[in-house]
Structure formats: C-alpha cells, structure tokens
Amino acid sequence: MKKNIYLLFLFTSLYTVAQQKIPLTQPDSVQFMTEIVIKGFESDRRLLETPVSAGIVSRSDVQRFSTASLLPALNIVPGVRMEERSPGSYRLSIRGSLLRSPFGVRNVKVYWNDIPFTDAGGNTYFNLVDQHSIAQIEILKGPGGSLYGANTGGVIILHPEEPPFLQENISAEHHFRVQVNGGSYGLLDENAQWKYQDKNISSLLTQSHLQSDGYRQNTRVRRDVIQWNGSAHLSEKDKLDWILMYADMYYQTPGGLNMQQMQENPRQARPGTAFTPGAVEQKAAIYNKTPFAGISNRHNFNKNWSNITSVMLAYTDFKNPFITNFETRKETNLGLRTKMVYHAITGKQDLKFIAGMEWLHNYSAINNYGNQRGKADTIQFKDKIRARQVSPFVQGEWMMGKKFQLQAGIGSNFFIYRYRRLTDADDSKKKKKLDGQLLPRLAGLFLISENISLYASVSKGFSPPAIGEVRPSEGSFHRNLQPEYGWNREIGVRGRTLANRLQFDITAYRFRLNDAIVRRIDSADAEYFVNAGGTNQKGIETFAEYVLVQNTTAFIKSAKLRASITLNDFSFTDYMIDDKNYSGNDLTGVAKTIWAGGFDIATRWGLYLNTSFTHTSKLPLNDGNTFYAPSYNILLGRLGWKKQFNAFSVELFTGVDNALNQLYSLGNDVNAFGNRYYNPAPKRNYYGGLIVTL
C-alpha cells in the first residue's frame, strides 16, 4: 500500500511534466555517469571505457538528502549498503562484506585520492569523514587485490574538489560557504568552508560540527572536524596533494533489543538483566580523537614515465565504555604507497604499465578495564599489538584501437601480527604470520558502439582478520582465525541510449569465498569472530537514470528519474559449528532484494524537489536463519529553493526522512545472544537548513 502511494505520487509528477511542451534534451546538455572519469585501477578513463564494476556518488547526490549523513546517497548504489545502528555508528559493506563489521568498515580498502586511509589492521574510521569536503566517492566493487592489497569487498576512493590549474588568466580567488542544518531529535549540522584558488594552488579549509540527541535513549552524538586539503603544482613536472584532518567524535551506543522490546518501546536503550547492567547505567559510548595527515606527489619524468608516491600518518585515541568492560586503545598508523607508471600511445595502440608497492604499519596499545558506570576500574588486560602489511603489485593495460581494452594485473600481500600481553605471567611475544598470497585480476572491455560497452573480469580477493577480530573487545587473542579468500567472476554492460536520455549499468557476478569470517556475540554481549567455511555469492546489480527534461529556458528546467535494483543470492557452504550444519542457509545480514528509486525536478525559479524510495526485503539475523528482520519501505523527500545573486548564492531547504513512519532496524546486530538483533531507526523526522555561498 505504501509503495503504491509513492508510485501514485511519482506518476502524478510525471504526468505534470509530460503536459508541458518542452524541447527535447540535447545530447551535450547532460553530464552522464558513464562520462565521469574513473581513477580506480589506474584507468583515468570514462566509466564507459573502464572494465570494472563501479558506483559513483557525487556531491549533488549527497545534497539530494539531509547532508548530515552519507547514508542515503550511498545506499542508492546497487551492491552497496551503509547501516547506522545509532547516530555516528556506521557500517559500510560492498556485496555482503557487512558480515564482518560490528562497526566501521572492514574488508574494504579506503583511499583519499592515492593516500591510504585504511590502516594495517584492516580498519577504517569512516564515520570521521566530513562529507562536506568530498566532491566524489568512487566505489570499485569486487576484489581489488591486484592493485590495492588485502580486500575482498572492494575499494572506495574519496575525491576532493579539484578545480582546473595552470590557467594563466586566473587571478587569486577566495570563496566562502556556510551551511546550517537542523532537525528532529536535536539535530544540528554546521559547516563552514574557505576555498582558495589560483593558477597553481587549490586549497579547501573546512570546519564542521554535528550533534544530535538521537531517537533512542543513549544515542547522543557529537562530531567536530577541522580539515585542510588541497593540491599544488610545484613545477611543470610535480603536483602535490595533501590532507590534514583532526576529528573529535563522541557517540553513545544504546545496544540491541529483541523483537518484543522493540515493539513495546523502540526508543529504549538495551535494559539491564539479572546478569549484566544496561547501556544507560554503564554509560556505553565511543570516544575517538584522531589526527590524520597525508601527502601525495606526482612527478612526471617525461611524457611516458611518472611516479606517484603517497605517505600517511595517523594517531587515534579511542575509548569505549561498554556494558561489560572499558576498553582504551592508542593506535599509531603509518603508510607508504608508491608506483611507477609508463604510458605510451603509438598509432592505434595505447599501452600503460604500473608497478609499485604499499606498506602499512599499525601499533596498538589496548587496555581493558572493568566498567563502573562509565569509569575505568580494575585492569583486566594490557596488550600491545603490531600489524604490518606489504603489498607489491604490477598491472598492464592495453587499448587496441578504439574498441578493445585488456587489463591484467597481479598483486601479493604479506601480513604479520606481533602480540604481547603485559598482564600475563608469561608476557612473551606471540606472532601470527600469514603466507604470502598472489592476487591476480584479468579484465577486458569491448565497445559495442560509441555509447555502449561490454566488460568482464576475473579476480581473486584476500582479506586477513582485522585487529578487532584477532583481538576483539572481550580480550582473547584468536591466533587460529584464518584469512578469507575467494574468486570473483563478473560480466557487465553499460551505456546510454534513447537520444542520450537513458543511461544504464547492469552487472552479474559470482563470488565464492572460503574461510569466511563471521561475527558472533556471547552471553555477556561481547563479540568474537569465527571462520564459517565458505559462501557462494551470486548477484545482479542494475542502475538506470532517465532524463525527462533538461532545458534552462523552460519553467521546468530539469526532471530526472533514477532506479537501482540489487538481487542477492548469497548462501553458506561447508559451514558447521559443533553439530549444527548451516550449509545452504542464506548469508546472515544480507537482503535478497533491494530496490531504490528517485525522482528529481527543478524549475527556472529555483524551486526543486528530490524524492527517493527504497524497499528492502527481509534478511536473516543469525546463521541458522531462525530469525529474520521484516522487510521495510523508506520514503525520503527534500524541497528547496536556490537563488544566484551577483556576488553570492542562497539555498533554503526542508525535508523529511522515513515519511512512511516505518518501524525498522537500519543496523542489525547479527548472531546476537538473547535475540537482541534490533537497533530501531528514527520514525518520521524532519530537517531544514540554509546554505550561503560567496
């Protein structure tokens, strides 16, 4: 019924648009996704000419919704799922990799341009990223080990805004932008930016503050970020990119509820039991203070040879008063990535060769204490862990004429942990060294026509257990936990047609994962991880966008439809624990069907309306498939007005999230003890804001 309401609204809007006598869209008046240049796998080509399954999230995609979170924009990309157990507690997966992530991002590598953002322990604090400073998010789906080291889910590349350089007639320019966004449950999202640009330098200084009281008890969040990133042409041969960031984040963790508790009072935090106190009593929360610095230099030796070298340094002060303990972590992370690139064009042949390596090092001092109502008590464990990854790689790319392209690459990964428990009588060092892995990838692309391409690829992925999995919060060191690995095969077609009004991207894949790492929770609500045999993951991902109107002289100057469909057939294979056989069961936490649609319309007067509807089918909450989260439908909308004046522009907007007032859980605790799977998301809520640009 609720789906039908959205469809009725959609078709009514389309009928209104159709009644107007509007000229046809001109082919060169629309920027298509297939025309966006992809940087991943060293392509530097249009997506139409790149043999990789990729999703693109632009700044305009983020601004279709409340800009307090990246979640709605990322969840439109087929095969990608971002969850929010509570404000600030994000999880991000590509093609089912959420199975391993109680929070944050695991099994997916993240980069800021060429600068590594994921640490050697396999963890990424994605919730520290200030979405206001991102111009584009590039998502490479499927294993990327041939060029990006350890991962089986995929790769995410964050791109800042980069205006053109080396234009002699450009004088120094300063631009300022201020945004304030407020809403239900005490939401306040404030952002201020100063951008400087001349013919050699582009820099962006950003300050942002986010806070919310949250929908549930014990879900308050506060995040402050100051960031300076930019690019500079040091000479005709050298270009330097940099990022300096300091993030201070605090968010409360309410804990999961069972179905009865969620239905009785979805706003409550996890209550106490006869054996353990509740989340409110223990003041369960996360405190994260992280400075991060990265630089990347590109040097062109001549027209054929170049080198790109990136260095990163980060330090994290992490505290987590939890229901059963109080954990502190001091993490120091170092990273180096360097690659030599040879590129030559001779006649109809375009040849590119890349060779390089990535080195990541993590040192973590982890202490566990008792938790006395949010204060650290008696020491339980005191550990020191070092993790190191070395990933050499080579890749060749051959463009034969204008029709055919071949990519072939192979990488390797060498991984080692060193662990020492200082509170044990035997405090000798322990070591876990993984055998080196060869990670090949072969991909090809054929241009069927000027606007349609067909591609296919075969690749191997490898992902060692993260520090949080080898040494989870309950304090044990799981030396027997093995890395997961598998082969991925996929084929896809993409392009544009119907007088360039319609663009489409369709991918089918099969990924067989061995020794899959899955999360479990014990009776004390402490997490631990086990290898679960294997998984068989088959999927189809489709995306389509249709431009109804693109005409700046008409009253309705633009109108656009978009839709994405994700079909997942994921199951366990060879998975037994004790006497229980889970082989053939659906993969935990993965919905079989996700459908997302959107309709955007803008007028010459500056008025605009963005809508989005998402249907998520039921999904299993435990490996035994005895509990499922119900399906749900989410409707979002944003109404606004933009006006460009001589020296500045103004935008006013208001919006609604969960307009259908659904009761659902957007971040489930899979395999939770006591059936406490559910983290209820906010009911219908509203926001509004103002943007001023000078």
Feature-to-residue mapping (PLM):
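C-terminal beta-signal and adjacent terminal beta-strands/loops
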Residues: Y509, A559, K618-P620, W641-L694
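Short acidic/polar hinge/loop motifs at secondary-structure boundaries
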Residues: I115-K141, N480
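Structural signature of Gram-negative outer-membrane beta-barrels, strongest in the C-terminal barrel
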Residues: D350-H361, D383-R512, V549, S558
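Extracytoplasmic beta-strand/coil segments of soluble accessory domains associated
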Residues: L71-I115
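Membrane-embedded beta-barrel scaffold of Gram-negative outer-membrane proteins
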Residues: N300, S306-M312, F318-K319, L447, ...
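Gram-negative outer-membrane beta-barrel transporters
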Residues: K402, A508-R512, V530-L619, I691
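Face-selective signature of the C-terminal outer-membrane beta-barrel domain
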Residues: E236-A247, K283-D424, I540, A544, ...
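N-terminal periplasmic accessory domains that precede
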Residues: L70-A73, R91-S93, V108-Y111, T124-D130, ...
